[in-house]
Amino acid sequence: MLVNKSSNRAWTTTDYPGIERSLFRNNDTGGRSSVVRLAKGSRFPRHAHHGCEEVVVLFGNVAIGGVDLGSGDYLFTSPGEEHDVVAVSDALIFVSSQMGTPVVE
């Protein structure tokens, strides 16, 4: 059993200002599951995944690939489907990807 309690969650800064990640797990194919914290106005550049990706917005508002999402919304991307992530407000999202994430921008 793997547990990541919010009360002792470790946050790691990313290469993108205003975006932090708390990694839950990595898998053998380069994918991972994590919670991503985004400050309003922050942006993760256009990218695609070798495998599928699933996103659940835990709170706040984001635009992923031009689709506006709010608390409780779910998004699925197919392998190779390019998208960016823009924080419309402060937000927290759960992200699970099957494989690595090459940035295309």
Where does each model-flagged region fall?
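Short, charged/polar surface micro-motifs in flexible loops or helix N-caps
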Residues: 29-31, 40-42, 99-101
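A short, N-terminal "cap"/entry segment at the start of jelly-roll beta-barrel domains
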Residues: 1-30
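Short histidine-centered beta-strand/loop micro-motifs
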Residues: 25-26, 34-36, 45-49, 66-67, ...
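Conserved hydrophobic/aromatic beta-strand scaffold that supports enzyme active sites
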Residues: 21-23, 33-37, 54, 74-76
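Glycine- and acidic-residue-biased ligand/ion/polar-headgroup-sensing regions
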Residues: 40, 49-64
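Ligand-binding loop in jelly-roll beta-barrel domains
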Residues: 19, 79-105
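Short acidic-glycine-tyrosine-enriched beta hairpin
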Residues: 64-87
